[in-house]
Amino acid sequence: MEMNVGKIVNTHGVKGEVKILTASDFAAERFKPGKVLMIPFKNERVTLTIKSYRTHKNFHMLAFEGLNNINDVEKYKGLDVYQEIENEDIILDENEYFYSDIIGCTVFDGEREIGIVNDIFETGANDVWVVQGDKEYLIPYIEDVVKSIDIDNKKIIIEAIEGLL
């Protein structure tokens, strides 16, 4: 399955490194050197192999094999990057889920439908789900709030703490 794993938001330095704003979970695993990314560019699909990966100020910094200066990567700025995903290669602990499993789930506060998870971002302490309903809600993925997750039926039950909704 091919999945959008981020966007090249800028170049970094003059040696061909790019800043990626991730749209995926497990970035350190997804962006390991040797992994392959695809970029739709001018009606083609460019395939790039990751040469190096590091984090810097909440961004993921990548360099690609064969692209050794800023001129080689400048043209990809602003483009989404995709990867062939094999989620089954990553073993999850209990109460851990892939972003792709959570995004698209309908969230309920008891019986009341709140909305659909359309994005997830990391805060350091816990993930926060962006839920779009009659307005946008930010739901922390913490035990006190999230009571059950049913991936098969794309249904999440929360117990909203005061001020959350």
UniProtKB/Swiss-Prot annotation:
Q: Which UniProt keywords apply?
A: Chaperone, Cytoplasm, Ribosome biogenesis, rRNA processing
Just give the chief location class: cytoplasm
Database matches in Gene3D superfamilies: PRC-barrel domain, RimM
Q: Which residues form a coiled coil?
A: none
User: Which InterPro entries does its entry note?
Assistant: PRC_barrel-like_sf, PRC_RimM, RimM, RimM_N, RimM_N_sf, Transl_B-barrel_sf
Pfam families in the cross-refs: PRC_RimM, RimM
Q: Which GO molecular function entries does the Swiss-Prot or TrEMBL record give?
A: ribosome binding
A biological-process GO annotation: ribosomal small subunit biogenesis
What is a single cellular component term in the Gene Ontology annotation? ribosome
Where in or outside the cell? Cytoplasm
The segment(s) forming the PRC barrel domain are 93-164
Transmembrane segments annotated in the record for this chain: none
Domain comment (free text): The PRC barrel domain binds ribosomal protein uS19.
List, alphabetically, the NCBIfam families matched: 16S_RimM
Primary role: An accessory protein needed during the final step in the assembly of 30S ribosomal subunit, possibly for assembly of the head region. Essential for efficient processing of 16S rRNA. May be needed both before and after RbfA during the maturation of 16S rRNA. It has affinity for free ribosomal 30S subunits but not for 70S ribosomes.
Q: What subunit structure does UniProt give?
A: Binds ribosomal protein uS19.
Q: Which family does it belong to?
A: Belongs to the RimM family.
This chain's protein is named Ribosome maturation factor RimM
Which organism is the protein's source?
Answer: Macrococcus caseolyticus (strain JCSC5402)
Species lineage, top-down?
Bacteria, Bacillati, Bacillota, Bacilli, Bacillales
Q: Which gene encodes it?
A: rimM
